[in-house]
From Swiss-Prot:
CC terms in the record's Gene Ontology section: cytosol
Catalytic activity line of the entry: 3-deoxy-alpha-D-manno-oct-2-ulosonate + CTP = CMP-3-deoxy-beta-D-manno-octulosonate + diphosphate
Pathway info: Nucleotide-sugar biosynthesis; CMP-3-deoxy-D-manno-octulosonate biosynthesis; CMP-3-deoxy-D-manno-octulosonate from 3-deoxy-D-manno-octulosonate and CTP: step 1/1; Bacterial outer membrane biogenesis; lipopolysaccharide biosynthesis
Pfam families: CTP_transf_3
Name of the protein this chain belongs to: 3-deoxy-manno-octulosonate cytidylyltransferase
Keywords attached to this entry: Cytoplasm, Lipopolysaccharide biosynthesis, Nucleotidyltransferase, Transferase
Assigned EC number: 2.7.7.38
Family of the protein in this entry: Belongs to the KdsB family.
Subcellular location: Cytoplasm
Amino acid sequence: MTFTVLIPARLASTRLPNKPLADIGGAPMVVRVAQRVLSGAGLAGRVRVVVAGDSPLIIEACQVHGIEAVLTRTDHPSGSDRLAEACDLLRLGDDEIVVNVQGDEPLIDPSLVAAVAGLLLNQPAASMSTAAHAINSEAEFNNRNVVKVVLDAQGLALYFSRAPIPCWRDQPLSANDSAALPSPPPLRHIGLYAYRVGFLRRFPTLAQAPIEITESLEQLRALWHGYRIAVHIAPHAPGPGVDTPEDLERVRHLFGA
């Protein structure tokens, strides 16, 4: 299996300006993300990693460290639009698979990236794939910032929601009691996606779905329009991303340890 990892990177960030270029152990964060993916066991020769940046500064930083990069427009309304442009710039075929890895995840697990790509390759009915892991507390289950997903018998997503789904009508939960969560446990969505390139090119042209707007979840647009999303069940939660200066300091400490 061969696939392409696209890492969208834009300089504008309200909480952490110039985030892709933030130094982590002597290299920009977006470079650390690319290096992390390339370090995955068994991925050598199977994965092409490309940063899709919106500034020449990002492109130059990647090139200095030997990371492939393409310059995309600054006016894209969403990350999906940026990825679609990158696919065109790279002349990728419609049947190829790309994985969207966020540029602020220097601790991403390369095996998770490979698993999501492999799942899509083996699920011909799906247009895209993603991942999830078990929720182990009621507080997490009820948190609106935690996106939940429910699957069908084939491991395809039925729905994503910020609400606690599924709802166990006859089994009330006790506050912060992991033992009260029914089995099998509910699933927390991990924001990692693989796409068939042809679908990724169509996606930005699809009308926004009412449920997408209500939940503020872009992946619901695919379900609304009848496309299927395969879901890989990961054994544990992914490493933390970088959204704030405090997150950045924690990651710097981990790289320096």
